[in-house]
Structures are given as C-alpha cells and as structure tokens.
A protein has these predicted regions:
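Gram-negative (and chloroplast) outer-membrane scaffold detector with strong preference
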Residues: 32-142, 163
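Solvent-exposed loop/turn segments connecting transmembrane beta-strands
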Residues: 16-30, 47-57, 149-156
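Short, hydrophobic/aromatic-rich segments at coil-to-beta transitions
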Residues: 12-18, 40-42
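Cleavable N-terminal export/targeting peptides
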Residues: 1-14, 170
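A generic structural motif
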Residues: 24-26, 36, 161
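Outer-membrane beta-barrel "beta-signal"
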Residues: 155-170
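C-terminal or late-domain output modules
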Residues: 143-147
Length: 170
C-alpha cells in the first residue's frame, strides 16, 4: 500500500537498518533506502532524555549518489546534515546532614540552564564494503559546523570528521 502512495519507495532496490556515527550523518540508529538508479537517502536518530527533561538528541539526514558499484562494495558521494541538541538544567541532589551527623536527607540544588544546538553539514566521499547481508562504510566529509549556545550563534569551523556506518540490508 505504501509503495503505491509513494512512487520513490516503489523503486527501492534495497533497504538498510543499522548503526550510524559521524559529523554529517548524525549518531544513532539509521535507516536507509538505496534506489536501483544509484540515488539513496538515510536518516538517523538517537534521543536520550532524563526524567527531569535534561536531554541529548542526535539526528541526521543524508542523500547519496553511487559513483561505482560491484558485488563487494561501492564508492559514493553524499550530502548530509546532522544536528546535536543538548539541555542540562544544572539541577542536582546533595546529601546533607546536621552537625551531629543525624537527620540526613537529600536536598535538591537548582543550577543554571545550559542549552544549545550544533548543526554540521557538507559533502563527502565514501567507500562501502559488503559481506553477504551486511555493509560497513567509511566516509570523509567536509563538515561545516555552526552552533547556538548560551544565547549566542556562531561559526564553529570546517572539519574533515569521518562518518561510519554498519548496516544490515535486504
């Protein structure tokens, strides 16, 4: 049914699921679709949220274009965007006792909120190696990084920070 609603999905040559980590791919669980015409895309997500809503969230989205492919692997270029969000309320618990060491209790201490987001985007070139139903890929992108932290937006630099993925495909 979904294949009929979305023609791009109907043309998919293979699907992948696995682990992704990198500057322009994001970090976390990844899902990818590769089309028979050499185009593909990938999304990744890893949310970590505490009970007090302190959070660290990684997410990413990438477009691929296969340059050359054979039975053991492929070479490709990509264009990716990743985001990293963090929030720390600074609140913590402290164990406090009176002067006699009696009447001890936990006391909540309020801290200062630290919140920010970093975006990393750019093109990259990668190689992928296949074994049966598994693929491992290493890519070197040129990641342009910008961020917002403590009410200040800024350019954080351009860095060749690699991307890595380990995927199961069908």
């Amino acid at each position: 049914m979904i294949s009929l609603l979305f023609p791009v999905t109907a043309m998919a040559d293979e699907q992948r699921i696995g682990f992704v980590a990198g500057s322009t791919h994001g970090v976390g669980l990844g899902y990818s679709r590769q089309q028979s015409n050499g185009h593909g895309w990938q999304v990744s997500l890893l949310p970590i949220v505490d009970e007090d809503l302190d959070a660290t969230v990684f997410m990413g989205g990438t477009l691929f274009r296969t340059l050359n492919s054979n039975s053991w692997g492929r070479a490709y270029w990509s264009l990716g965007l990743a985001a990293f969000y963090h929030r720390d309320s600074g609140d913590h618990w402290e164990y406090v006792c009176d002067d006699n060491g009696e009447n001890c209790r936990d006391v909540e201490r309020t801290g200062q909120l630290d919140e920010g987001v970093m975006f990393s985007f750019g093109p990259g070139v990668g190689l992928e190696r296949r074994w049966k139903q598994f693929a491992i890929a290493l890519e070197l992108p040129l990641a342009v990084q910008v961020g917002y932290n403590n009410k200040s937006f800024g350019f954080l630099g351009m860095h060749p920070i690699p991307n890595f993925s380990l995927m199961y495909f069908w």
